[in-house]
Amino acid sequence: MTDFSFACTGVRADRYAAGPTLVFRLRVTAAAGARVHALALRCQIRIEPARRAYGAAEADGLSDLFGERSRWGSTLQPVQFAQVALMVPSFTGEIETDLVVPCTYDMDVAATRYLTALTDGEVPLLMLFSGTAFTGDGGFQVEPVPWDREAAFRMPVTTWREMIEQHFPGCGWIRLPRDTMDALLAYRSRHALTSWEATLKALLGDDGGGNGDGGDDGVLAPPARDPFRALTGSTGRTDP
């Protein structure tokens, strides 16, 4: 059976993609210069948080994921980042190819929350490979790529931030249930608010002059049947 090894040699943000996308440069090596007709790969990418240090601000941002820093010895577990498929074309011995990984800025996804909390340095990644190889010099042979094939890589945090800024410059992104979105739309229309930023600031009582729906202390006190109750109901939070 052909022995395969994998290495990640770099990563870049794809500035021409329709959505946030990272492109990892992958080197695939077949032992003894074996002839490979094609390689159908499955790649699982994990973040390994325990393989880097964190500043105080980063630790605060990660508390929702891993709890208090004193507990990190047991809670700093791997986080799933992506799972993608790749078809590698014919090669002999060694080849380099691109592994395209679509990403999300959904703050409900653990990997996104982790990456957003980082201020600098590198993201420790582990790529796990499996799949099917079609090999043979004078014929055609089908072989499995065993599950123990892997490659470690440290992705610069700046690459992630560059990718996000290309698609969401200066912005964040959250996912809401449809009924909550309908409630927000109704609230925005009823109060003739010109933007989503203004809508959320009004709900938070952050209009700068104390004239919005918030009280004197800046805390929102929604009236009966106000759409904000739909927000608190969908998120599991209690009303002020």
Which residue stretches match the model-derived regions?
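Short aromatic-acidic-glycine turn motif
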Residues: 46-57
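Extended, solvent-exposed segments with strong compositional bias
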Residues: 61-116
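Surface-exposed, Lys/Arg-rich phosphate-binding patches that contact polyanionic backbones
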Residues: 178-195
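Short, basic amphipathic alpha-helical segments that act as recognition/interaction helices
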Residues: 194-225
